[in-house]
C-alpha cells in the first residue's frame, strides 16, 4: 500500500511534524505515494488539529503474528486471515514496515511452530505479491539452535524473498532468557500436562541437547545467512561473554554490545 505510485496527491495540515532533528508546525504534501515537501501549516487539506505526525515505525521483532494463528488454547486459525488481522493491528500502531518474526525450530514448548512455519511463509509471500497488506511485511527468522530440526527448516525457508533478518537463539533453561531451571520445569509440567518428574527429565534432556547440538546448528544458520547477505542478530544476550561471542561472529548485530560500551551493563 505505501509503495503506491498512482495514489492521488493529498495534504496533511496543521501538524506537529517530527523530523530527524526537530518538530515542525506545518503540512506534509504527499504525491505518488511519497512525501513531496513540507509546507505551511495553513495549507488546504486534511487538518490534524496540531497532533503529532511521525514517520512510519519499523518493527524489527514482533511475535504477534503467531498470536493470531493461535488465538486461544486448542484453536488454530488459518494463516491468511491471521495475517490479515495482524496487518491491521500493525498499521493501527503506526508501524509501516514490520519484520514478522517466525520461529524456526522449537526448544520444547510450542513445538507446533515447526508445522506452522512453511504455511505462514507461503501465505505471507502470496499476500505480498497480491498487494493485500497495508504495511510492508518482511521476515525475521528466529532460529532455535538447540533444536537439530532447525538445520533442515532454515535451509527450506531462508531463500524466501521476504527474509531480511535472522536471529540465533537458545531457549534451553539455565542461561540467557531463562536462568531459573526449576521455573522452566514447572512451566513444562503445566504446558505439556505431564508429571513433575517427567517435566524435569525432559528439561535435563533439553539442556544436554543444547550443549550437544547448539554449536553446530548455530554455525549452520550463520553460514546460511552469510551466504545470502542476510544480517544476523544475537538474542537474549545477558552477559559480556554473550556479547563477546556475538562479536566474534563477523556480521552479528548485538544490541547488548551498545549497552556494555555505554557502561549500562557490566556482567
Describe each PLM feature range.
Residues 58-60, 98-100, 137-141, 164-168, ...:
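Hydrophobic faces of well-ordered beta-strands that scaffold small-molecule active sites
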Residues 93, 161, 248-249:
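Structural motif
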Residues 44, 48-51, 83-90, 151-166:
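Short amphipathic alpha-helices and their capping/turn segments at secondary-structure boundaries
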Residues 14-15, 20, 49, 56, ...:
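Fold-independent oxyanion-binding glycine-rich loops
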Residues 139, 227, 236-267:
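Active-site-adjacent C-terminal substructures of enzyme catalytic domains
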Residues 105-238:
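Metal-coordinating catalytic core of metallo-dependent amide/deamination hydrolases
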Residues 2-11, 16-54:
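Histidine-rich, glycine-flanked metal-binding segment
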Residues 51-120:
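Metal-associated gating/positioning segment near the N- to mid-region
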Amino acid at each position: 500500500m505505501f509503495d503506491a505510485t498512482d495514489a492521488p496527491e493529498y495534504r496533511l495540515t496543521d501538524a506537529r511534524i517530527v523530523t530527524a532533528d526537530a518538530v515542525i508546525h506545518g503540512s506534509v504534501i504527499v504525491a505518488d505515494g511519497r512525501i513531496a515537501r513540507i509546507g505551511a501549516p495553513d495549507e488546504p487539506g486534511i487538518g490534524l488539529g496540531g497532533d503529532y505526525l511521525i514517520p512510519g515505525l519499523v518493527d524489527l521483532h514482533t511475535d504477534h503474528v503467531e498470536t493470531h494463528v493461535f488465538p486461544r488454547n486448542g484453536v488454530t486459525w488459518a494463516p491468511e486471515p491471521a495475517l490479515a488481522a495482524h496487518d491491521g493491528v500493525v498499521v493501527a500502531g503506526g508501524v509501516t514496515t514490520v519484520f514478522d518474526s517466525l520461529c524456526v525450530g522449537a526448544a520444547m514448548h510450542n513445538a507446533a511452530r515447526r508445522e506452522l512455519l512453511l504455511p505462514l511463509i507461503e501465505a505471507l509471500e502470496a499476500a505480498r505479491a497480491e498487494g493485500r497488506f497495508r504495511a510492508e511485511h518482511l521476515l525475521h527468522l528466529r532460529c532455535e539452535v538447540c533444536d537439530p530440526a532447525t538445520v533442515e527448516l532454515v535451509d527450506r525457508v531462508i531463500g524466501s524473498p521476504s527474509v531480511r533478518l535472522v536471529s540465533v537463539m537458545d531457549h534451553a533453561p539455565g542461561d540467557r532468557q531463562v536462568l531459573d531451571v526449576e521455573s522452566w520445569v514447572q512451566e513444562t509440567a503445566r504446558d505439556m500436562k505431564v508429571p513433575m518428574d517427567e517435566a524435569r527429565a525432559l528439561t535435563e534432556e533439553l539442556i544436554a541437547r543444547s550443549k550437544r547440538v547448539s554449536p553446530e546448528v548455530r554455525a549452520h544458520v550463520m553460514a546460511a545467512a552469510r551466504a545470502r547477505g542476510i544480517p544476523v542478530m544475537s538474542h537474549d544476550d545477558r552477559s559480556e561473554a554473550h556479547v563477546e561471542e556475538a562479536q566474534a561472529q563477523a556480521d552479528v548485530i548485538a544490541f547488548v554490545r551498545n549497552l556494555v560500551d555505554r557502561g549500562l551493563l557490566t556482567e
